[in-house]
């Protein structure tokens, strides 16, 4: 079997990480794997797994990107993949149109993955046009059926994102060298009740909700400190500055650490006391939430989307009504005194092997 993945880039993000994990698992099972994207920091992880990477600008939201359709069609003819797996809307349009240009004898099975709750319109409908459609959670499947009713339910398979339990487990601890470097880089965290907010710097990630949350906890005498872990992508610099100014106005400039993009997120999650999910709109899954829970770290998050589903399974007390920072402060104040323990070990279908078998089952159809 040969699988070709199309996605915008290989920068940080949940979709990119899932593709890296698929490359690792598929290549280990002898499945020839090719990734087509605009490239990025995670490209080395793809090639280290044994997959090949082909750099093409197929992720830009521009009409010019559709000039890539003939090139991708040519690539399909040359590579002859059995499966064309499309992971995002612009690459999905390019890949779907390219596949339709290929002679039927060479046309691969087209699989699309709904990784997020996209706006419902013609542009997003491409994600439901695959021969097979993967939803990363039950709430994602409901979203597809409710908003794209022409999609037969039997065409949709729920394959949750996963965690590698050989790497993420409650007993895992960062190395002594890592701890020394962490304390050297961020001495302000010593003795603090650290709250990790992972994810790219975007408005919907809810970083602004840290302001009332930190203010409330500090008013109770709890030395709460936010650790915001994620890159500020080009075009988001003004938002980053807006957030920094808001923290400063609230007198919280010394209560926040910005780490930028970190390749060692597993260690960072272990180093922090609690991981937060403050997304203002539902997430389709919540990959970092699962990673933290697998490490035995408590997660407090807004009770919607995939994060709500995960907390239902692993730590129901961590669910907070969306936007209710007062309720979250009450919960965290309790956890400051008595940290909870998430459910362990990781059950099916959230293990890496479950995800790989789920994808192979879809590909085999």
Spans of features found by a protein language model:
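Short His-centered aromatic/hydrophobic patch
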Residues: 86-92, 114
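Short hydrophobic beta-strand element within catalytic cores of glycosyltransferases
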Residues: 35, 298-301
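A charged, aromatic-enriched C-terminal amphipathic alpha-helix characteristic of glycosyltransferases
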Residues: 14, 167-170, 174, 339-365
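Conserved acidic donor-binding segment of nucleotide-sugar-dependent glycosyltransferases
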Residues: 313-326, 333-339
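A conserved, positively charged/aromatic
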Residues: 104-138
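A conserved mid-protein helix/loop that constitutes part of the nucleotide-sugar donor-binding site
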Residues: 13-21, 193, 197-216
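Active-site donor-binding acidic/aromatic loop of nucleotide-activated sugar
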Residues: 234-240, 253-262, 268
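Glycosyltransferase donor-sugar binding loop
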Residues: 36-41, 198, 225-241
């Amino acid at each position: 079997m040969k699988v070709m993945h199309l996605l915008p880039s290989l920068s940080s993000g949940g979709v990119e990480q899932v593709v890296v994990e698929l490359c690792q698992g598929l290549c280990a099972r002898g499945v020839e794997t090719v990734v087509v994207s605009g490239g990025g920091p995670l490209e080395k992880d793809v090639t280290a797994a044994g997959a090949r990477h082909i750099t093409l600008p197929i992720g830009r939201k521009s009409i010019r990107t559709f000039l890539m359709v003939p090139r991708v069609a040519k690539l399909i003819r040359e590579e002859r993949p059995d499966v064309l797996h499309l992971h995002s809307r612009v690459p999905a349009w390019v890949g779907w149109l390219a596949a339709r240009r290929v002679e039927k004898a060479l046309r691969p099975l087209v699989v699309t993955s709904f990784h997020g709750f996209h706006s419902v319109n013609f542009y997003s409908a491409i994600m439901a046009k695959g021969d097979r459609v993967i939803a990363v959670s039950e709430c994602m499947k409901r979203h597809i059926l409710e908003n794209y009713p022409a999609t037969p339910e039997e065409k949709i398979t729920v394959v949750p994102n996963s965690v590698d339990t050989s790497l993420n487990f409650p007993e895992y601890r960062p190395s002594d060298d890592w701890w020394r470097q962490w304390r050297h880089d961020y001495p302000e965290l010593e003795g603090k009740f650290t709250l990790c907010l992972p994810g790219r710097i975007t408005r919907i990630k809810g970083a602004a909700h840290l302001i009332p949350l930190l203010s409330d906890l500090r008013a109770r005498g709890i030395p709460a400190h936010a650790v915001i872990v994620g890159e500020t992508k080009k075009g988001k610099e003004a938002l980053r500055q807006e957030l920094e100014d808001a923290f400063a106005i609230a007198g919280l400039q010394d209560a926040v650490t910005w780490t930028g993009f970190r390749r060692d997120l597993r260690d960072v999650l272990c180093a922090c006391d609690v991981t937060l999910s403050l997304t203002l709109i539902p997430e389709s899954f919540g990959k970092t939430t699962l990673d933290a829970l697998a490490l035995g770290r408590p997660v407090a998050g807004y009770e919607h989307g995939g994060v709500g589903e995960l907390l239902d399974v692993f730590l129901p007390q961590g669910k907070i009504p969306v936007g209710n920072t007062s309720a979250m402060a009450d919960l965290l104040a309790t956890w400051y005194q008595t940290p909870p323990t998430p459910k362990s070990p990781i059950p099916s279908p959230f293990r890496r092997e479950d995800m790989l078998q789920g994808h192979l089952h879809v590909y085999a159809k």
